[in-house]
């Protein structure tokens, strides 16, 4: 069941708040059809104020139950006297301007003298309890048309809205908030959202009692009840007519931006927060030095193949992948030559073993394979002791030559190992003497230690900067554990 505590008098209270006080107290004469409708719900006079007319129309809608039970602001009056008066099959009480126009079409203005006598009559009527009309009431001399009345009311309402707009510009934010609350409380769009029953005594209530009952809910009940339903029943057009709220979203780029109510300028510490550079240390083998303020364009090296400017740390060109010139020491070529010479010496030593003769000549394969079948048996018999003697003499010479050759090979191997050690030491000393690969100015004296190993490729200052920025080792990409200052003698 829908809420039966309803009354269109809320429409009257809310709608009449839009009308100036002078127009609310002005008496108007309803046309016969509208007068018939008003008298059907207890009206007894011929002239009424706008408050009384709106109240009686609300009573009529409530008595006939012309409103929709689900959407109570919609009124269906197609087959009713109200539809004949307004000339529409249905309407919504949220369209208050349309309702004013339909009511004004059925009203006739009353002159000032006529309105003054009628007002005094309406005030005396509740006290005396008589329904007699004033016999001295003079007929109206000039009756302006309904169109003139509508234009006059609209002009006055526009003037009032302009004056209210000018007053709102001078108000403080707190007063504006309170006025906004008051305007929402008396919004005409909330007319039939919650219709309340104002007349418990039936249809015999007088005009003065009806006006008092109209003012009572508008100032007491609506302030408490409308705030709960203002979000559902609020009309955008009516709200925009009463007030407008404009604001700008504050941002960091705003000139008047402040971190507190008093406001203060940004300090150097605040600036440092925005200068933090985040380095992504993923699985990539290269590191970016574009955001490093310590490395300038003067530290970059130019590729000899494609003339591309590259950061100081990578050893290869990022465009053509060419090795940087003078990146590795020149001893690498000498090592290759020494290795080739060592291989040749070993091959020659293997070829000379077992082929030495007493006279120092080398036997060829053809000499060793000469046949002895041509000699006679006698010659063989004579030569056998000589060959034995020669064998006796040749054995010590062969063994001595083998020992000599082995000693020479051992000496050569020792010399080669010494030369290799010297070359390694010289290359190590050269690498240590070379400048830092990052700053290209200081010597390599900062060893980057990770676990049980370390890499010596930068100076101590640059290595400390890498450690402070939580960057990995540029060579092996392992996390840096500590930096050791290295000295060379």
Curated annotation (Swiss-Prot):
GO terms for cellular component: centriolar satellite; cytoplasm; cytosol; glutamatergic synapse; nuclear body; nucleolus; nucleus; postsynaptic density. Residues 221-230 are annotated as: Interaction with USP7. Keywords: Apoptosis, Cytoplasm, Metal-binding, Nucleus, Phosphoprotein, Proto-oncogene, Transferase, Ubl conjugation, Ubl conjugation pathway, Zinc, Zinc-finger. Residues 1-22, 114-183, 197-235, 250-271, 342-426 are annotated as: Disordered. Disruption phenotype: Loss of Dlg4 ubiquitination. This is E3 ubiquitin-protein ligase Mdm2. Ubiquitously expressed at low-level throughout embryo development and in adult tissues. MDM2-p90 is much more abundant than MDM2-p76 in testis, brain, heart, and kidney, but in the thymus, spleen, and intestine, the levels of the MDM2 proteins are roughly equivalent. The lineage of its organism: Eukaryota, Metazoa, Chordata, Craniata, Vertebrata. The keyword Transferase applies. A motif (Nucleolar localization signal) lies at residues 464-471.
């Amino acid at each position: 069941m829908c809420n039966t505590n309803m009354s269109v008098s809320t429409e009257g209270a809310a709608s009449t708040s839009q009308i100036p006080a002078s127009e609310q107290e002005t008496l108007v004469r309803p046309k016969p059809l509208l007068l018939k409708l008003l008298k059907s719900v207890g009206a007894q006079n011929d002239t009424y104020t706008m408050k009384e007319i709106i109240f009686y129309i609300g009573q009529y809608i409530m008595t006939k139950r012309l409103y929709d039970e689900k959407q109570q602001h919609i009124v269906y009056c197609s087959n009713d006297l109200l539809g004949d008066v307004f000339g529409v099959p249905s309407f919504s009480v949220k369209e208050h301007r349309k309702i004013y126009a339909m009511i004004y079409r059925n009203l006739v203005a009353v002159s000032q003298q006529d309105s003054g006598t009628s007002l005094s009559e309406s005030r005396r009527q509740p006290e005396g309890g008589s329904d007699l009309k004033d016999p001295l009431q003079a007929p109206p001399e000039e009756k302006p048309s309904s169109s003139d009345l509508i234009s006059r009311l609209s002009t006055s309402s526009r003037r009032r809205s302009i004056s209210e707009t000018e007053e709102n510009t001078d108000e403080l934010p707190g007063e504006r908030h309170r006025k906004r609350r008051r305007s929402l409380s008396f919004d005409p769009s909330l007319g039939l959202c919650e219709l309340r029953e104002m007349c418990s005594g039936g249809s015999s209530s007088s005009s003065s009692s009806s006006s008092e009952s109209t003012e009572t809910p508008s100032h007491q009940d609506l302030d408490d009840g409308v705030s709960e339903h203002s979000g559902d029943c609020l009309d955008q057009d009516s709200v925009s007519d009463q007030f407008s709220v404009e604001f700008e979203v504050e941002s960091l780029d705003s000139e008047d931006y402040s971190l507190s109510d008093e406001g203060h300028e940004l300090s150097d510490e605040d600036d440092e927060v925005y200068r933090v550079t985040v380095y992504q240390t993923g699985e990539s083998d290269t590191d970016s030095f574009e955001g490093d303020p310590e490395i300038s364009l003067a530290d970059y090296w130019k590729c000899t193949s494609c003339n591309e400017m590259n950061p100081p740390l990578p050893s290869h060109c990022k465009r053509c992948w060419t090795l940087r010139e003078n990146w590795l020491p020149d001893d690498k070529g000498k090592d290759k030559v020494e290795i080739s010479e060592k291989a040749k010496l070993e091959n020659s030593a293997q070829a000379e073993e077992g082929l030495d003769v007493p006279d120092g000549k080398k036997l060829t394969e053809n000499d060793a394979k000469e046949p002895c079948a041509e000699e006679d048996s006698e010659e063989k018999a004579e030569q056998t002791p000589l060959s034995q003697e020669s064998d006796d003499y040749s054995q010590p010479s062969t063994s001595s030559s083998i020992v000599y050759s082995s000693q020479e090979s051992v000496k050569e191997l020792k010399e080669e190992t010494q030369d290799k050690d010297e070359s390694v030491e010289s290359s190590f000393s050269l690498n240590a003497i070379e400048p830092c690969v990052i700053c290209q100015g200081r010597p390599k004296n900062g060893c980057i230690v990770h676990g049980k190993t370390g890499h010596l490729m930068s100076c101590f200052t640059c290595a400390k900067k890498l450690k402070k920025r939580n960057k990995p080792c540029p060579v092996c990409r392992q996390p840096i554990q500590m930096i050791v200052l290295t000295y060379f003698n």
